[in-house]
Amino acid sequence: MEFLTNEKLTIVGAAGMIGSNMAQTAIMMHLTPNICLYDPYGPGLEGVAEEMLHCGFEGLNLTYTSDIKEALTGAKYIVSSGGAARKAGMTREDLLKGNAAIAEEFGKNVKAYCPDVKHVVVIFNPADITGLITLAALDSTRLRSELAKHFHISPDKVENCRTYGGHGEQMAVYASTAKVDGKPLLEIIGTPALTAEQWAEIQSKVTKGGANIINLRGRSSF
């Protein structure tokens, strides 16, 4: 059986409905054989793992743990649905206080245990806010895209781009973690390959990326 990658994928909140379905979907799509399931609720987590193992998926290396350090260490991809569920009578905003704290703690754990993770997906509500609290994934991808265009290389050769803050012109666009074709971006900025002025222009394009798309298309969504 061929997989898209052999790198580790961690599913956070795997004992829940969304998390367990994400685990099954990842396995059936042959994303990677190396999948780790994490949830603080041990019995439910073990039940999900047993159910997946009983399916007899070929080539699957499935592990599970309630230790967040063990779950995240070595992970290159993470999907997190590890927030509280919305109950009857609750609004999305009612979830914010508790789930924002969960998202903040999750972000700190990612930084501590797998700082070289390639992609993080946050899908617990209110997802538009919890996702931003954890990692500004869309804006980080925009930074990678702009750097790839500038250097005329594949986006796959631009790694570890990071942006933080709100989804607008007040966001912070960092160079400290990024690498371009294996070379730290900080070592390139200020050279003829990427002058300080060009870097400032790229930062501006990233923070105004959404507005630019709207100007070009006349609308924001498909």
Locate each region found by the language model:
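Generic hydrophobic/aromatic pocket-lining and core-packing "Φ" positions
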Residues: 23-24, 107
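N-terminal Rossmann-fold NAD(P) dinucleotide-binding loop
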Residues: 19-20
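Conserved glycine-rich cofactor-binding loop
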Residues: 15
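Rossmann-like NAD(P)(H) cofactor-binding subdomain of soluble oxidoreductases
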Residues: 92-146
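Redox-cofactor binding/interface segments in oxidoreductases and associated redox assembly factors
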Residues: 79-80, 122
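Conserved N-terminal Rossmann-fold NAD(P) cofactor-binding segment
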Residues: 6, 31-76, 84-86, 90-91
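C-terminal substrate-binding/catalytic lobe of Rossmann-fold NAD(P)-dependent dehydrogenases
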Residues: 132-133, 139-222
